[in-house]
């Protein structure tokens, strides 16, 4: 098997996606940590503002990466078939809702939010909240968690009530843009509340 054929296979595609996502994760974390350290060292307004903005963005990007890989591992641990995309992408794999069992789809669904929770726990463990930037980082992560919970949990409830996975997906996400706007507002509200609470504590 040639190197080109190996790279084009499922394992090669997964390796490529993992490296790209890891690079994006480390870049987001690195930019934030640099700006946060600058803000902590100077206490000046501009570095602090930049650290807050970087924290919010990094919280979102890092949460998204953990969320998608949580979905992936949930599906794979349940024995579901997944198709890895050839080109690097934020949503890096496809899941066959029509051909998967309810148990497999529920495992997929549970894995995503668990990934969000995991990155929050790891961040709390490794970065004490001693700056507005770090408060913003956690706020971005909490906001992302609330967004995905309101966006995805209704599908889980429909499947648990006996609806076929593909019907549950189509029925819920068929609401279109109003659904995403509503979940975005809830996520932003949760993130803002988290940020203000951490600043006061």
Task: Please provide the spans of the model-predicted regions.
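Hydrophobic transmembrane alpha-helices and their immediate loop junctions
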Residues: 2-201
């Amino acid at each position: 098997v040639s190197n080109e054929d190996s790279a084009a296979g499922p394992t090669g595609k997964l390796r490529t996606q993992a490296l790209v996502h890891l690079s994006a994760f480390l870049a987001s974390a690195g930019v934030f940590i640099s700006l946060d350290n600058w803000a902590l060292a100077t206490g000046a307004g501009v570095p602090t503002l930049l650290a807050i903005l970087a924290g919010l963005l990094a919280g979102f990007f890092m949460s998204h990466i953990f969320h998608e890989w949580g979905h992936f591992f949930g599906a794979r641990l349940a024995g579901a078939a997944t198709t890895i995309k050839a080109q690097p992408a934020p949503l890096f794999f496809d899941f066959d809702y029509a051909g998967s069992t309810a148990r497999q789809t529920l495992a997929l669904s549970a894995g995503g939010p668990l990934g969000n929770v995991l990155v929050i726990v790891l961040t709390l463990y490794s970065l004490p909240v001693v700056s507005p930037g770090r408060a913003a980082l956690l706020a971005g992560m909490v906001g992302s968690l609330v967004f995905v919970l309101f966006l995805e949990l209704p599908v889980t409830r429909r499947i648990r009530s006996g609806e076929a996975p593909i019907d549950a997906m189509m029925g819920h996400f068929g609401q279109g843009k109003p659904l995403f706007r509503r979940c975005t507002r809830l996520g932003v509200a949760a993130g803002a509340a988290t940020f203000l609470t951490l600043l006061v504590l």
